[in-house]
Amino acid sequence: MLVTAYLSFVGLLASCLGLELSRCRARPPGRACSNPSFLQFQLDFYQVYFLALAADWLQAPYLYKLYQHYHFLEGQIAILYVCGLASTVLFGLVASSLVDWLGRKKSCVLFSLTYSLCCITKLSQDYFVLLVGRALGGLSTALLFSAFEAWYIHEHVERHDFPAEWIPATFARAAFWNHVLAVAAGVAAEAVASWIGLGPVAPFVAAIPLLALTGALALRNWGENYDRQRAFSKTCAGGLRCLLSDRRVLLLGVIQALFESVIFIFVFLWTPVLDPHGAPLGIVFSSFMAASLLGSSLYRIATSKRYHLQPMHLLSLAVLIVVFSLFMLTFSTSPGQENPVESFIAFLLIELACGLYFPSMSFLRRKVIPETEQAGVLNWFRVPLHLLACLGLLVLHDSDRKTGTRNMFSICSAVMVTTLLAVAGLFTVVRHDAELRVPSPTGEPYAPEL
């Protein structure tokens, strides 16, 4: 398993580098890329945001292993994960309103403080302290995915008066480097866990200086900005109306809730499936992230002028890949017949599918959901998503250890088949919708049906 993990990591990384280099050579330079003021503004944002992302990714490979190292049972670990998911959905519902009221810069500093406290709790073996740490982690995650982006958009448009059309370029580059940071974080986590002598808690300790630097740079380099948004109740009410009045939005919500709840369960299960067979967890995690990066690169190539596939096609492909992978896992995790290499390959395919899924879903959401209703609609999307993930973990909590993992993958397979039916329903609804097609090189919607 050790050799398989390292060979897979090297092969995936080489594939990603080759695709990205060829894409960069073929890409024409844009006006935004040569604007010194814009580049400096991007740099001020990236140096804070990337530190926050690096600290977040550094903790991911060893979270389950840490709880296992503290001799908690799988059911107890499942409850810790459920607590984290529940706090994420609760804080996620109010995060945007909190950030707008408190201030985006202060919210980013608050993120660095709460996430540092979350890491400190990992030094304790007390179950209640770890539960508190998971709650703090949920708050921190909600702030990470709301405060930083909100700060950037306000500064970009209101303070610097750059064209709004340049915003996607910033976040596209951020998405790419987010994958790169995730790959590097897995290698770093493996190194510190193996060499420092602290064991699985080492990556959490190593994340604290990064978080402190995140808060310090935000305090020093960023200006404060606020936004008076409409009331939280009105935001949710408007989002619910949009969700129920447009079948496309409803189907997108169903697909997101089902697909991403399965991914949350995968995040919980990969460590207990591979760790008993001597897998280097940090390198395995980096391989996962490299597979996801490869999927994102393939998405960009597939939707380019040369191939011109549509996001709807790639969303369907992503779901099909996950269905196939989960069927593989159902057999490769059978008690007494475990095949860790086959399970590892299935996990890599799931991550590859995620690399196709997330940009496809982002494109479709952006086209289908009105900008004024996106916050409210996404809040409604997140509730069933996290509830399904929590339910799955609770079912696993009550299962027999020997058969529980296999049974959970069987349930996830059924969920993904349902997701595939929802994708087919969405495909039927939007097949004549030119708005949901990537524009052709001539600027006209691509002629063939979705």
Curated annotation (Swiss-Prot):
Subcellular location(s) per record: Cell membrane
Q: What SUPFAM superfamilies does the record tag this protein with?
A: MFS general substrate transporter
Keyword vocabulary terms for this entry: Cell membrane, Ion transport, Membrane, Transmembrane, Transmembrane helix, Transport
Q: Name one GO molecular function term.
A: molybdate ion transmembrane transporter activity
Question: In the UniProt record, does the keyword Ion transport occur?
Answer: yes
The record gives the membrane topology as: Multi-pass membrane protein
Transmembrane regions: 1-21, 38-58, 79-99, 128-148, 167-187, 191-211, 249-269, 278-298, 311-331, 344-364, 376-396, 409-429
Q: Does the keyword Calcium apply?
A: no
Q: Which Pfam families match?
A: MFS_5
Q: Which GO terms describe its biological process?
A: monoatomic ion transport; response to food; response to starvation
Q: Name one GO cellular component term.
A: plasma membrane
Q: What does this protein do?
A: Mediates high-affinity intracellular uptake of the rare oligo-element molybdenum.
Quote the protein name from its UniProt record. Answer: Molybdate-anion transporter
Q: Which organism is it from?
A: Mus musculus
